[in-house]
Structure formats: C-alpha cells, structure tokens
Amino acid sequence: MTGTDDGTKAGTRGPARASGPRVPAPWVRTRLRAAPAAALALALLVALTAALAAAFPRAVDRYEDAGLRRTLDDASPRRTTVQFFAPRPDLELSLGEGENALREAALRKGYDAVLAAVDKPLVADRAQSSYGVRTSDPTDASESFLARPSGLPPRVALVAQNALGAHSRPASGRLPRATDPVTATTSEVEAAVTTETARTLHIKVGSVIHVPGLERAPLAVRITGIVAPREPDGAYWMSTPLIREPSLIQLPSDGGTYWIGALLLAPDAGPVLLGTPGKPERYWQVAPDTSGPTAHDVSGLASAVAALESGPGLARIRERVDPLTDATTDLDEVLSSFTELRSGIAPLVAVAAFGAGTVAAVVILMASGLAAERRRGELALVRARGGSLPGVLGRLLAETAVVAVPAGALGLGAALLAVPHARRSSAVAAALAVTVLACVALPVRAAFAHRAVRVHGGREDIASVRPSRRRTVAELTVLVLATAAVAALRRGGTDDAGSSGGSGDQLVALAPVLVGVIAALVLVRLYPFPLRRLAGPAGRLRGVVAPLSLARAGRTSASTALPLLALLTALTTAAFGGSVLAGVHTARDHAALLATGADGRIEATHALPTALPGRIRDTRGVREAVPVSVAYRAQARRGSGTAGETAALVGVEPGPYGQLSRELDLGGFPARTLRATGPGGSGSGSGSGSGKAVVPAIASPSLAARFGTAPFSVQLEDDSKVTVRIAAVRDVTPAVTDLDFLVVDREALTRRAARPTALLLTGGHLDGAALRRAAGGGVDVRLRAEVRTAYVHSPLQSGAERIYTAAVAAGAGYAVLALLLALVRAAPERSALLARLRTMGLTRAQGRRLLVLESLPQALLAAVGGALTGWAAIRLLAPGLDLTAIAVAGRPAPGGTARLRTDALSLLVPSLAVLVVATGVALAQAWWTGRRGSVRELRAGDGR
C-alpha cells in the first residue's frame, strides 16, 4: 500500500475527502446570498405595508375613542349621570324608622347597593358620584331680604348631600353641622349656600330662612357658611345644577318671575325634611368615569345603562334599597348620538381603507411576480432535473418567510410604537395578513407557472394572447360582485351600511374598488384590439421609432392586468377620496355661508347704531357691509279674519343686497325686482305703515305656494303693516336661514321698521377681534370662517379626514410603486433592445423617444381609464353617499344633505401624475442605459 501514516495519498496535499454522500448547500441561505438586494427590497415592502396595515385600525380606534370622550365631555353631567331616586320611606313605618332611613348611614348603604349593580364596562366615578335626600317640591321663603325680581317670593329646596366639605371650600363662615341627632321635629338646622346662590338671592352668613312646616312650626334654616365649589363643572355639582346656582323661573302669560335656590344642609340632617311639605326623596347619583370607556365598549355601555334604567340592575337595586326606586338618565341618548355619528363616518373611511389595501396587495403580488419572472429559468431547470413541485414550493415558501416574517414583525412593532393606546388584536391580524400574503404570493405564482415541466415557453404578447375560460368566469364573478355592491350602495346608502354591519357593508365599502377592478379587466380586454389594428399600418410609416414603439407595445407581456389593476384602483380611490374630501369642505363652507348669510354677520335684537355701518366698513378686511332690517315674527295673512303665517320680513336696499345675493349665489335677483317705481332706494324708510301701497316682494317657496301672486298684508312686530305682492321666488336669501321669508325694499317700511338690525359683511380676511371691538357690546358678531370651524367639532370628523387623506396618499404611493415595478420588470429587455439598436445606428435621442413611446400606451390607458373610472364611480355611487355626518357632525346645519360631487382636480391630477412618472422613468432608463454602454447587453446566448 502506498501512502502515509495520516491517511493521505502520496503526492497529494492535505487529507483525503471523506467518503459518503455529499451535503448540499442550504437552499435558503444560498438564495439569500445570491440576491441580497431583492431580499432587502421585499423586507422593506413587507415592513412598510405591515406597519401601515397595523397602524390603520389603531388610528381608527384612537380617533373613535377621542370622539367618544369628547361626546361624553360635551354632554352635561345632568345628562350623563345615572340618577336613582326613591320617595320618602313607607308611611307604615314608625317615625323613628322613617327618620333612620334618611340618615347618612342608611343612604350610604343604599349607595353601596347601587354601585354594586353597575356592570362593566360602565364604571362609576366615585369621586363625583353622590347621594343624599332632598325636597322634590321647593317651598316658598318669605324673608324680605331675599331677591324678588317681580315681587314674587323665591322658593328654596332643602338638600342634604354627602361629602359637601370634600367638594367645596368655605368662602366665608363654616360648613353646616348636625351636632345633635336631627329629627322631623327639629326646630332649627344649619345650612350653607354656594357663592352664586348667595350673590343672586342676597343671602349672607347668619341669615335665617324659614321654611313652612308640615303639621308643625316653620323650620328655621340658619346660614353658617358660603361655599365655593372646588369643581363647579363636575358631576357632584352639575348632576343637580340647582345646588350650585339658582334658577330664574318665568310664569306663563307674563305672570312674573321668581328664583329657585338650594340650601345645603349637613349630610346627616336629612330627617328634618320629613317635617316639611317639600315631598322629600332619597337619591343616588352615579357619575360615569368618562376617561376609561373606549369606542369598542359603546355597545356594552349601552347595555349596562339599559340594565340600570329598566333591566336586571334596577331589579337588584329595588330588591336591596326600595321597591319604589326608579332611575333616569340621558346617557343612552348620548351614546346613541355617538353611534349615529360613527355609523355615518365609518363607511366612508372603509372605502379608502379597502382602496389602499387593494393597491398594496396588488403591489405585493407584482413584487412576487417580478421575483418569479426573474427566476423563471432557474425554477424551470430545477423542475426539468427532477425537482418536485411541492418541494420547490416549500423551499420558495421558506426563503420568502425568512425575509417576510421578521419584516412583518418589525412593521407591527413600529405601528404599535407609533400609534399607542389602542387595541392590538386588529393590528396583529392586519400585519399577519400582509405577512401571509407576502409569504405565499411567490410560491403560488410559481405553482401556476411550473405545473408542467418545460424549459422554454412561447411568447405571451398582449396582442396575440386570448383570454382563457377561467379568466372569463373570474371576470364575470367580479362583475356580478361589483354590480351588487353599487346597487346596494345606491339603494341603501352608507347610513344603512354603517348601521347594519356584516359582510354586506364590506361589499358596499368595496364598491369603488370593484368598479376599478371591472374597468381594469375591461381595458385589458380592449387594449389588444387597437394594437392589432395598428400593427399593419405602422409598418408602412416612415422612420423607425413610431412603428418600432408600437410593435414593442404590442409585444409587451400579457401579464399587464396587475399593474393596470393597481393603477386604476389607486386612481379610482384617489378620485373618489379627493371628491369626498372636497365635498366635505364644500358642504361645510356652504353650511357656514347659509348660517351667516355672508362672510360675516353683525346682528342685534334691536336697531343697530346709526354710525355702526361706517365703523364696520373702515375695519380692516371688510370690503362691503350691507345693512338689512329683519322682523322675525311678522304675520302674513290674506284678509283680517284669516290666520296669520309667521315669516321673516327682510327690508333691504335692492341694489347692494341683490348684488350680494348674486355674488354668494344665494337667491340672486336684479334690483328692479323689488323696485315698484323708479330706481330710488335710499333705504331711509319713507313708508307710512298703513299697508295701502302694494310693494313687490321676493318670497320663499312655501309662502309663494300659499299666497300666490295676489296682494296680501304683512303685520310687523311694531304693529305697522305693509301690503306685498310676490314678484319672485327664491329658495334661500342671505338675511335669514331656515325660515319662511319675504324680502322687500326698505323704502316701503316705516322709519322705525326700516332701521337696520343686521349687517352682512364681505371680505377675504375678516378680523373677528377688530370687528367685535368696532361693534361694541349688545350685538352678535359671527364670521363664516368661525362657523365653518365649529362644524369640525368631533375628533371623529378630524380623525376620519386624516385617515382618509393618509389612505388615499398611501394608495397613490403604492400605485407609483406598481408603475415602477412594471417598468423595472421590462427594464432588462429594454436595455438590451437599446444596445442592439444602437449598433444599428439608433441615436440616443431616438432611443429616448422609443422608450417613452413604448411606455406611453399603457400609461395613457391607465391615466384616461383612471379618470373615466373615477368619474363613473362617483356618478354611480353619489346617490347613496351622505357626507353630512363627516361634514357637520350632527350639528344643526342649514343646506340639507351633503352629497358627493365630482372634483375635477381629484380626477385629473392623479392621472397626469401617472403620465409624468411613466415618462420620467422611461427617460431616466434611456439616460442610464446610455451611460452604461452596450458591451454588457450584447452577450452571446442571451435569450432576451
């Protein structure tokens, strides 16, 4: 045997290779090392998409939670507090037992029982909740020092509420005490009043107020202190506002006014109320904790409130406290208003979310398709050498998952950090969906491409490939879904969608996306026909660029459905979303215009000072100030014996007021419509007020329908009369809103009635502070911009608008990415083509034109198709979309329902952007190819 002792063969270097099977290189590691840039690009795409997908539901949760808190905070504690009350103890009880039932210990026991009946997610705010005993029927107080605005004695309620010292601080004197056990026969008790009550009713420390007794002498209530509430707007004081400040009561038929106030007794002085005729009652007030509930808890909150009002919770309270205990609250109505607003906004946000999500999904599929196309030869070779389809797909899934799963987790973590304090379940589900799609897209695409073992396949030119039956069936299925969604939205609208829930609502939200999908499929079907028709004539054209570019466009790969789908979906969503946002802004601006009648409005209940119009015109930003006189309670009637119709009679100067109406498009009219004789129109008010002369008037439709064109009489609030004849009918007029109106020339009115009570201001940048200084006190100054801002009150509105804008922007970004992916996919073939054509004499300028003209047909198809699809989607879906909820948030707003209208900028700008990007990328590719040279692209055996 020849060799060495260490087992090496003679003449060799190093040890001999070990015998046995060879260990193959790990597939995943090898592939990642072979294409690190592609792996990094996929990781970035998955991380970004997962972050956006996870952030969306959390952002929605955050603005909905903020909207719920704003709704609860805006509602007064009197509405949100759940109040339980029970009458005086059973008359069958002894006097001592009845007195014990009104002492603080017994009330505290009932309070604990009430709190125990509160079910989650409703949580009581113990710091602001209260209990006690009070007289439900205030009694007269005859002391002469008390305030009597019209000579009537004030009335006082006796209230013994817990924790008075913890919720107030003495402004003077001390808190009331109950040193000895108080009974129904106690002759004198101590009490405190709030600073507001003391100031209004003229009460001082040491004052004694006598309250009538029930079968006993009057009860003397000595004021020992005046207290200032620590949290005057808290539920402790505002659940029953009377204990904080008195209320002025107006008797009917001008019977006078009187005050009602509250005297705050010591918490353990409740038994004394049994000796008064004030009908004492026990009460327990549960203030909800408004900081804890989320929008996700609204249905549970409503159920908990219903249980306390008339359900199992109230039954438990009656069992443990008193069988006659009853409950009342408006918290259910507050929650219902929030739910209604959210239901009106959520479907609109869902439309944007589905649009952006669809485009993002298409981009991920395109990225996977690009990877599959890049590795077509490799995978075909593996299959030809015996690789099984499941084995190949499993390895593709593994190498994709190694990149996508960490990237998805990174995107989820970024979303959780960027949008804190919201539910995680929806975010995790969204990020998981993105990750799964990224993992399976490449294997599924490879499975369809390599079902059969083949090395070379035929060309799939868009102008020659015929759609398969499966594709036809799939397209017809999508067409049916889109038709159903559009029909459902037109029939039921987003209001029904937001309130019913379920898969039908998701189908409605998908309607714009499905319209874009159908348009993409139709355009892909139609696109080859003009290319086939133009192929012959193009060959007879002079020059090489035009026929070659058309031939290249016709030989584009048939797999253009995904890029076109992404572009059309993004363009449709952008046009639809832009029109929604433009419609919201237009609706707010129009509602604010109707509410003010101009850019600004200065109005008083009395005649304005004579010098005020001049001062206002001199204020910075004011272009014109049009004076008008408005009598809101004028009575229009035909004949003296007929019932009057209340209407607002507006006296105007026909010239300036008519011009203002025309400029604002609020029922414009020529000045001659209101002039009975000649131009005139000084507005001095030279009418006699007798109503003999007939003057022309502009009327609202309802008045015109009732009175026609015959003259009729109008009586003003100062008893003067004017006889008018309706000369024109207008739906709106700047001076009044949501009222029947008659507009006449001020010259026909008496001097008193013609004095202006309002000024309608125009100007681009009105200064509210300067106008208020110039107007002085006693007048109301309203600006159109301020009213418009007030319509954006709920975080539901502002949050939904931000989310909608972000979704549209994300969809546009993904559309650009889809366009770039489509161009990148064709980049190697285009580079090789340019290199070969340059060897044949093609100039650089011709190369640039060739690439631009080659990419222009598809870009032009997407741009024109996107604009038309967006327009069609808006026209189809507008009847079912109500923008009122997101525009004015349920606030009283004139102008009726806000409907979706086409916005030209939203249609044209995205489409033009597609053309610009496509042209720019083609020019950049031509420039870069020219810099690199042609040697690398002219390799022998290249199959491109």
Identify the role of each PLM range.
Residues 1-360, 424, 494-509, 522, ...:
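Membrane transport/envelope proteins' first extracytoplasmic loop
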Residues 1-30, 319-323, 640, 679-690, ...:
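Actinobacteria-biased recognition of intrinsically disordered, low-complexity terminal regions
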Residues 9-11, 37-41, 49-55, 274-279, ...:
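Alpha-helical transmembrane segments, especially those used as permease/efflux helices
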Residues 31, 362-401, 818-860, 939:
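Interfacial "coupling" helices/loops that link adjacent transmembrane helices in transporter permeases
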Residues 138-201, 624, 628-711:
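Short beta-strand boundary microenvironments
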Residues 350-370, 803-825, 857, 861, ...:
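Selective detector of the "anchor" transmembrane alpha-helix that sits immediately C-terminal
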Residues 355, 398-423, 726, 810, ...:
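Hydrophobic alpha-helical transmembrane segments that constitute the membrane-spanning cores
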Residues 492-678, 691, 696:
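Juxtamembrane segments of multi-pass membrane proteins
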